[in-house]
């Protein structure tokens, strides 16, 4: 084997030719001699010649065999060489990707070793961003601060991405009339990421039958984001080249707030039905038909789809279960349990009557105008959906959730355009209370811990809205509570509320303490609801956020009887179990339990901090921030 590999190529070729020539001569000679010996002439040869030629023929035969063996050896050597070459090639082909993979792994290891987690405490990177370089992390975090969601990821996702169909399977069996009203979709935005708006538009176009979708109207409430100017205009032109006249954009010259932006879109709409949406949404399949069919059945109904949630960090969709939209006495929105009347229908596709709506709604365009559209006096954000819901219910319409219409809504981690919405929420809540809540409006003041008189909050001129209420001959808020939202329970026995201080140290206030937990504490005074206290003429002392609902209980200050420290117990349960929850109190006086006769007081612990105790009454007295009617002396601290 090694011998053949070492032969020079020219020598190898020459040797091969020589052997071939010799073989030809041998065979030729052998043939001649054989012919002479056994040929057709059959001549007799002398004996010595006969022997001589026989020996030659024998030798030639041996030589032929040897040469044949040599030829076979050469063939075998060549085949072995080919096998070796083939094996080497195959080995190289197999090893090459392994070596490449090992090299890649080494590079990745080096890469990970050099990368740092630049923002270990950022909520953006809890479940996302493991493979980002440091430069990518910085870019993603900057966009997160700017928009309140993962705009970096949004910019990489397809605009026409697929999201899970979250409808109940029975919704897929429903059929709708072939003739349905036309639809105007209104998208409200301020300083959204461009890719978010584009994805909303794309989902609407792709998942709404073109015969139903008349227009998409974008309302920009004075964005400062540069890409929402020229770049957005260019995108709209591209959409309109493919779908002529479908998209329109209206830009406010100044910030007007959510309610007025929705009114701007409504005023520009021309279809039979308007759907007013946030721009950070993706509509799901079959979202429009249930809306249009229901409004075609009843023009006085305001409807809302079911929300699903798009996570702010991963953009994954979380399915939300069907619920109705409610609110508390601060007019904060929330989800409430489904009404028993709907459950008894045994039809999961049926519309659900709801006390309120969230931020997305659809309505007959003319009916929405007849009842006054949205209250343009609501500023910035908050309460406008509750105001509309109260007006619709009290003025002859109804509000419903449609189980078979679903929209995915992108949650924000924070609202960068308004980091503190408290002032706007308070102001808007008082405006709603003054217009629509009649003798129960005080509950909003109590919940927000605002003085009933001289609140110092300007909620705007409400005369035109009061005139509208009179014109529409609207029902009372008491009717609404009894017939639509019996969950809310107004209270009329509260005579003192707000922060409560012991005059030993007016820098600390009574506080509900850690949650979960039921131990009240003394803590540095602040304006959050954990320090709200509500004293009733009947003797209860609520501590913490005011609930005043049928399905949940406020927490009452309780004397446990033997222990030194007071507790907070659910009022309804405590009353049922005859716990010591009733107190005598007047502003500037002691707080005395009616049963145990012990006083609520405070003392310093070993660390010098004030702690609450129940003990024999000394000279300690308490003040409460606000009083109602003629109870005690009016205070405002």
Swiss-Prot record:
Gene3D superfamilies: 2.80.10.50, Spore Coat Polysaccharide Biosynthesis Protein SpsA, Chain A (3.90.550.10). The keyword Ribosomal protein does not apply. Widely expressed. Expressed in heart, skeletal muscle, kidney, liver, small intestine and placenta. Weakly expressed in colon, thymus, spleen, lung and leukocyte. SMART domains: RICIN. It comes from the Eukaryota. Residues 30-637 are lumenal. Pfam families: Glycos_transf_2 (PF00535), Ricin_B_lectin (PF00652). Substrate binds at residues 221, 255, 412, 417. One of its GO terms (molecular function) is polypeptide N-acetylgalactosaminyltransferase activity. It is found in: Golgi apparatus membrane. Residues 1-6 are cytoplasmic. Its EC number is 2.4.1.41. Residues 496-634 form the Ricin B-type lectin domain. GO terms for biological process: O-glycan processing; protein O-linked glycosylation. The chain crosses the membrane at residues 7-29. Residues 180-294 are annotated as: Catalytic subdomain A. Disulfide bonds join 171-404, 395-474, 509-525, 556-571, 599-617. Probably catalyzes the initial reaction in O-linked oligosaccharide biosynthesis, the transfer of an N-acetyl-D-galactosamine residue to a serine or threonine residue on the protein receptor. There are two conserved domains in the glycosyltransferase region: the N-terminal domain (domain A, also called GT1 motif), which is probably involved in manganese coordination and substrate binding and the C-terminal domain (domain B, also called Gal/GalNAc-T motif), which is probably involved in catalytic reaction and UDP-Gal binding. The ricin B-type lectin domain binds to GalNAc and contributes to the glycopeptide specificity. This is Probable polypeptide N-acetylgalactosaminyltransferase 8.
